[in-house]
Amino acid sequence: RCTLSLPSAPNQIDAKCGTLIVPENPSIPDGRLINLNIAVVPAISRKAEPDPLFVLAGGPGQSIIEIFPAIYPILFKLHQTRDIVLVDQRGTGQSNPLHCLNANDKFLNNDETIALLQSCPEKLDADLKYYTTDIAMKDLDQVRSVLGYSTINLYGTSYGTRAALTYL
């Protein structure tokens, strides 16, 4: 169990949270492994529909689990009868996050910023060629399967709409 919340949103949402371990390179199942951060917000009704709502974040780069409390009010009616499933795509949130910048970096000049961004890939604990929309949507389908859902509904905004189209 976990509680999803944001300082700027009044909602505190109870969820079931966990991780799914997947290979960073899907072609090498016994290679380097990464964790996908997952939260399932169970339907309010005891007679939930069998097809949950998977919510996809914008960005790319947003953590859906982190921002969900802010968008929950628009999904409240659907939540009455459907589980809501949140998966931080690889490289976002707590799913092997890809971060090079920190709060102090906002004070860098242009040359320093360019140098920092150019050195970023070598500093990351990731092989970036496996952090694509196609692979992230294969991860999403693996989450669907592991959770036992045969069909799902997708909801995305901004980049999440592109990700949803890739999934379909």
What are these regions (language model features)?
Residues 1-168:
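Gly/Pro-rich cap/lid or specificity-loop segments adjacent to the active site
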